[in-house]
């Protein structure tokens, strides 16, 4: 399912707030990460990514030349990362081998992984249906500090109370269902 106009507008505003945090982005080539929760149906994930990239590119010159780290969140034990051109993501070629995986996931492990391996990214987008859980609230809050929480934008279909409690720093945009 594609993002609506209101969600795209909120996303652009969230991106602007993240990039204008003092000390975050100072110009030049932007390095960003896009986490795709593989519990999303392939068609929905592809449409959402294409819509997001189109909106970002039309929004600002900053997104014309980007180092895009794509993180495929398949399960707690399987988090794959690859660097892909935004044009390839916009065309949808990385989704040719996409497999939907419905498993119980904990955001704790994803946040730990992002803190370790995506610390250089100035913007992190998480696309998910929001069906993940929080195993350890303390670990999540620790992973979000000092910078990760200020760089994350969560694009979710639904938000549970435990996920909402994490949003002290990370911004959440609920998609139309």
Question: Where are each of the predicted segments found?
Answer:
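Catalytic-core regions built around general acid/base machinery
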Residues: 52-59, 139-148
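Beta-strand elements of modular eukaryotic interaction domains
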Residues: 23, 59-61, 115, 143-144
């Amino acid at each position: 399912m594609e993002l609506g106009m209101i969600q795209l507008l909120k996303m652009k505003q969230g991106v602007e707030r993240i990039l204008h945090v003092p000390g975050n982005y100072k110009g030049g080539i932007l390095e960003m990460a896009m986490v795709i929760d593989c519990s999303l149906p392939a068609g929905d994930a592809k449409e959402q990514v294409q819509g997001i990239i189109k909106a970002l590119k039309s929004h600002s010159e900053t997104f014309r030349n980007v180092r895009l780290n794509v993180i495929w969140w398949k399960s707690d034990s399987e988090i794959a990362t690859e660097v892909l051109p935004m044009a390839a993501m916009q065309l949808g070629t990385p989704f040719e081998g996409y497999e939907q995986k419905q498993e119980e996931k904990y955001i704790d492990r994803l946040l730990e992984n992002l803190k370790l391996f995506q610390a250089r990214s100035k913007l992190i987008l998480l696309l998910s249906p929001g069906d993940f859980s929080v195993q350890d609230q303390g670990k999540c809050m620790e992973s979000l500090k000092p910078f990760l929480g200020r760089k994350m934008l969560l694009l979710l279909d639904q938000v549970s109370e435990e996920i909402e409690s994490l949003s002290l720093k990370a911004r959440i945009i609920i998609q139309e269902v």
